[in-house]
């Protein structure tokens, strides 16, 4: 038992809690990497993008991994903005506004995009039109993606940001030492509160992101039948 445990008998429990919360954070990070790569694959296949996949940096910090996802999403958003600008340029203003209208049927939106997608991409597929509608013509999906970026940036800037991803494999004491070293011996309780606070938002944002991109993929599969 560490000497501090005699003075703070709750420390062993807190160490276990930090360990558990750290794993939950890593699970959310891993999911966000996977979903971002799935989205990248869809964009490369159907919109002709050349986006690279990303991989969790196991020897990096939480901030470094958050930044990897943020950078990948920003590149995705840049490609989607190009498609949006092309649609705005090629479509009649009334038709373009319909793409942004949540009351319009998705099938009608796909039909609108289908009119000009060949001019934009060089070929016309209903799958490409569906991707454009789900990702460019949906303020809901855009909002979900932006929220994830915001949450990741907040985690990276928090006291958790400098914690190494791999410390979990080195044992609970190593996690504790890493945390204490990173924040100049801030109490375990503060670390737990930080994990809990950010996990609530991260889990919510990650789940919504996963759901939104899964919906895009399912729509594309339906269009390809």
Curated annotation (Swiss-Prot):
- InterPro entries, sorted: DUF4533 (IPR027895), SMCO3 (IPR040004)
According to the lineage, what is the superkingdom? Eukaryota
Membrane topology reported for the UniProt record: Single-pass membrane protein
Answer whether the UniProt record assigns the keyword Transmembrane to this protein: yes
What is its subcellular localisation? Membrane
The UniProt keyword set, sorted, is:
Coiled coil, Membrane, Transmembrane, Transmembrane helix
Query: Per the UniProt record, which residue ranges are transmembrane?
Result: 155-175
Q: Which Pfam families does the annotation name?
A: DUF4533
What positions belong to coiled-coil segments?
Answer: 62-92, 183-207
Write out the GO cellular component annotations: membrane
Query: What PANTHER family does this protein map onto?
Result: SINGLE-PASS MEMBRANE AND COILED-COIL DOMAIN-CONTAINING PROTEIN 3 (PTHR35972:SF1)
Q: What is this protein called?
A: Single-pass membrane and coiled-coil domain-containing protein 3
């Amino acid at each position: 038992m560490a000497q501090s445990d005699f003075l703070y008998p709750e420390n062993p429990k807190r160490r276990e809690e930090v360990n558990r919360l750290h794993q939950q954070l890593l699970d959310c990070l891993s999911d966000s990497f996977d979903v971002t790569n799935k989205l990248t694959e869809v964009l490369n296949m159907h919109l002709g993008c050349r986006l690279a996949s990303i991989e969790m940096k196991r020897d990096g910090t939480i901030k470094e991994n958050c930044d990897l996802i943020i950078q990948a999403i920003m590149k995705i958003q840049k490609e989607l903005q190009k498609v949006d600008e092309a649609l705005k340029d090629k479509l009649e203003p009334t038709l373009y506004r319909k793409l942004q209208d949540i009351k319009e049927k998705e099938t009608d939106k796909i039909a609108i995009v289908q009119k000009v997608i060949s001019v934009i991409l060089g070929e016309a597929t209903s799958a490409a039109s569906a991707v454009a509608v789900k990702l460019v013509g949906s303020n809901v999906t855009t909002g979900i993606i932006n929220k994830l970026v915001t949450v990741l940036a907040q985690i990276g800037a928090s006291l958790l940001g400098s914690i190494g991803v791999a410390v979990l494999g080195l044992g609970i004491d190593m996690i504790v030492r890493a945390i204490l070293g990173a924040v100049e011996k801030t109490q375990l309780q503060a670390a737990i509160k930080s994990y809990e606070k950010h996990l609530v938002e991260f889990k919510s944002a990650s789940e919504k992101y996963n759901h939104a991109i899964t919906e895009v993929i399912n729509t594309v599969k339906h269009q390809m039948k």
